């Protein structure tokens, strides 16, 4: 580490203020918090900030449904979010809201600077308009029949059934998802940010070598497809900030949302003496700026955000650290299975430090998805934290307290072993710095194994029974306690609460510099249990509680929908059985068992996945519009059913040689047909 402390500003992506924090959100906040705590442990100055993303049509409409104002709703959500983050020991220096005066002023300033510098233009566009609610409709608030495959009840930007992308004006029989009314076309002036003007700068920033390779590669794809002007305005009614100098025009939520990073920091500066906003945000700042985000919002953070900052005279981020999604037990989080776990539900049943440790043990610097396997979670935390690390203290502390009045030996008996533990500091530091937390944990647990091996070989419980060996006993146990101290110093960024209890036990603060020399002749306190093992019954209770939460949420949603429609509809009401056909017509359809050899996303297609299918001696390529329901890696190797004699169809992205069968209403609620084991590729389905 450099002699002069670094000055860092670190952010997490802003949670949207219309729902609860869940364990997927917590991955990012735990990852960032571990990195921040490591930096602080090394003496660097860190300002760690976040805020709620509190604008947009969904918030406005949800507040209306609840019968409260948007301001009331986002205030309640903010309180809930902050309580959840505090429960997981996320050490934010400030948590704010994008619906703040600081954000209004900064967003307006950035917009006016962009406009002054020639990066804002306007033109008239035609949009669908809800005549009952008197509002323009975002794409996702229009539903109708797909113009391509004629599937009903599809969103206004793409079809969940066939994967076709289109504008909402192309829908057949479009309806407003807000009121059910038939929308009409209406012209409106919109404002655009000229992103293409920043292409050279963005390419240079991409090639700087600081971005993750996956992010840089994705940006290169976007450059090759051509950057487009970005619509930054929305029409009233809209919950957000009005555009300066314009009437009934509001900033699109994604313009003022990232400005929320600046606004939260400005709010912190205004209440912290000596903290200078300009020092961190001026164009030539020597401070460091890092954003932790999920892979679903890379586009906004790697293109629009740095371009907005460049165009308005502010500094750009040093890096954008991107992580993958969280799965549970190998599948996407499911409300019906109870694996869609809210942060608050987890905190009622389990120690947050367990999740912090497990996430750390599986995190790396790549954009990989992380699977929370609940059985492995239990075994790893109990084996590593309880059996290896905490047990190291408990098996030595009793002798020190009972036989030596809590005092460690004056002489340290194993300097070479201790130096081996201290020598690992540089390796572990580099792994923390580069966000290779999983490798850091492996280094730490390997040291824990060595420490326990030492205690096993010295067997203090045997020495304690032998006459005249008090000094040897004290020295053995003092070595064990000191090795535990080093391990807990390394673990302090991951498990701050356990570290605090350890500091109380050792009667000394854990510092990175402090481990250079062992504690000798030092008095420790009487040992108390530092950490409890995970009881599988608590995990079962958490899953059941999550199911109950989901059921209650669904019941409330269904009740609201029923009241809105005055009658609930069955699946057959929504999708009636087709007219009868003759058996010969059905027999003409050749359905076969297929094994999914490979599955991948289709660039520039919002809903399509591309499959290579083995149908028993022949491989078929098929495109299917189920991307919103599955990740490609979830499907590879599975058996499914396909229509094999469907005439090949040439699509924009290639030839589709059949159709995969799936059931469900669409969106994320789609399920491919999966035959039982025993069925083989190529078998006919009768």
From Swiss-Prot:
GO biological process terms, semicolon-separated: methionyl-tRNA aminoacylation
Domain tRNA-binding residue range list: 585-686
Family: Belongs to the class-I aminoacyl-tRNA synthetase family. MetG type 1 subfamily.
Gene3D superfamilies named among the record's database cross-references: HUPs, Isoleucyl-tRNA Synthetase, Domain 1, Methionyl-tRNA synthetase, Zn-domain, Nucleic acid-binding proteins
Gene coding for it: metG
Name of the protein this chain belongs to: Methionine--tRNA ligase
CDD domains, A to Z: Anticodon_Ia_Met, MetRS_core, tRNA_bind_EcMetRS_like
Residue window of motif 'HIGH' region: 15-25
Enzyme class: ligase
Lineage of producing organism: Bacteria, Pseudomonadati, Pseudomonadota, Gammaproteobacteria, Vibrionales
Chemical reaction(s) catalysed: tRNA(Met) + L-methionine + ATP = L-methionyl-tRNA(Met) + AMP + diphosphate
């Amino acid at each position: 580490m450099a002699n002069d402390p670094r000055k860092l500003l670190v952010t997490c992506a802003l949670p949207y203020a219309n729902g609860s924090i869940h364990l997927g959100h917590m991955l990012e906040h735990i990852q960032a918090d571990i990195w921040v705590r490591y930096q602080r442990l090394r003496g660097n100055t860190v300002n760690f900030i976040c805020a709620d993303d509190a604008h947009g049509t969904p918030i406005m409409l949800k507040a209306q449904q609840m019968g409260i104002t948007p301001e009331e709703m986002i205030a309640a959500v903010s309180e809930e979010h902050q309580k959840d983050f505090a429960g997981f020991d996320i050490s934010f220096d400030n948590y704010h809201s994008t619906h703040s005066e600081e954000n209004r002023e900064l967003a307006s300033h950035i917009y006016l600077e962009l406009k002054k510098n020639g990066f804002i233009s306007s033109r008239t566009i035609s949009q669908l308009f809800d005549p009952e609610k008197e509002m323009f409709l975002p794409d996702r608030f229009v539903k109708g029949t797909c113009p391509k495959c004629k599937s009903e009840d599809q969103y206004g930007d793409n079809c969940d059934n066939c994967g076709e992308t289109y504008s909402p004006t192309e829908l057949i029989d479009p309806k407003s998802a807000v009121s059910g009314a038939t929308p009409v076309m209406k012209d409106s002036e919109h404002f655009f940010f000229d992103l293409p003007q920043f292409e050279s700068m963005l390419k240079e920033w991409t090639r700087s070598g600081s971005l993750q390779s996956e992010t840089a590669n994705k940006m290169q794809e976007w450059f090759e497809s051509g950057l487009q002007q970005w619509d930054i305005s929305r029409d009233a009614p809209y919950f957000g900030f009005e555009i300066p100098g314009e009437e009934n025009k509001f900033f699109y939520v994604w313009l003022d949302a990232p400005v929320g990073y600046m606004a939260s920091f400005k709010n912190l500066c205004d209440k912290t003496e000596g903290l200078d906003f300009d020092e961190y945000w001026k164009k030539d700042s020597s401070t460091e700026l890092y954003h932790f985000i999920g892979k679903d919002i890379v586009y906004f953070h790697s293109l629009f955000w740095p371009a907005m900052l460049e165009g308005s005279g502010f500094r750009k981020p040093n890096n954008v650290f991107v992580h993958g999604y969280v799965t549970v037990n190998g599948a996407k989080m499911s409300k019906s299975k109870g694996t869609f776990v809210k942060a608050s539900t987890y905190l009622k049943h389990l120690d947050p430090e367990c999740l912090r440790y497990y996430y750390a043990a599986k995190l790396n610097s790549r954009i990989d998805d992380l699977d929370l396997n609940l059985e492995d979670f239990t075994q790893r935390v109990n084996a590593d934290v309880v059996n290896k690390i905490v047990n190291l203290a408990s098996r030595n502390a009793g002798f020190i307290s009972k036989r030596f009045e809590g005092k460690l030996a004056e002489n340290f008996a194993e300097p070479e072993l201790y130096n081996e533990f201290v020598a690992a500091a540089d390796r572990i530091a580099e792994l923390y710095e580069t966000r290779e937390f999983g490798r850091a944990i492996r280094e730490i647990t390997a040291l824990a194994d060595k420490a326990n091996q030492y205690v096993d070989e010295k067997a203090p419980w045997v020495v304690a029974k032998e006459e005249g060996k008090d000094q040897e006993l004290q020295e053995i146990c003092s070595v064990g306690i000191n090795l535990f101290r080093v391990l807990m110093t390394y673990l302090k960024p991951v498990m701050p609460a356990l570290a605090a209890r350890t500091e109380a036990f050792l009667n000394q603060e854990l510092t990175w510099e402090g481990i250079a020399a062992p504690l000798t002749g030092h008095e420790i306190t009487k040992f108390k249990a530092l950490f409890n093992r995970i009881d599988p019954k608590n995990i079962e209770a958490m899953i059941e509680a999550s199911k109950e939460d989901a059921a209650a949420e669904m019941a409330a949603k269904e009740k609201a929908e029923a009241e809105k429609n005055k009658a609930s509809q069955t699946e057959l009401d929504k999708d009636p059985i087709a007219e009868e056909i003759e058996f010969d017509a059905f027999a003409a359809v050749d359905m076969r068992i297929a094994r999914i050899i490979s599955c991948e996303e289709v660039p520039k297609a919002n809903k399509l996945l591309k499959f290579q299918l083995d149908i028993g001696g022949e491989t078929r390529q098929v495109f299917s519009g189920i991307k919103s329901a599955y990740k490609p890696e979830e499907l590879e190797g599975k058996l499914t059913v396909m229509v094999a004699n469907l005439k090949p169809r040439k699509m924009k992205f290639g030839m589709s040689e059949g159709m995969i069968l799936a059931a469900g209403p669409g969106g994320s609620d789609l399920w491919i047909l999966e035959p039982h084991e025993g069925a083989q590729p190529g078998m006919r389905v009768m």
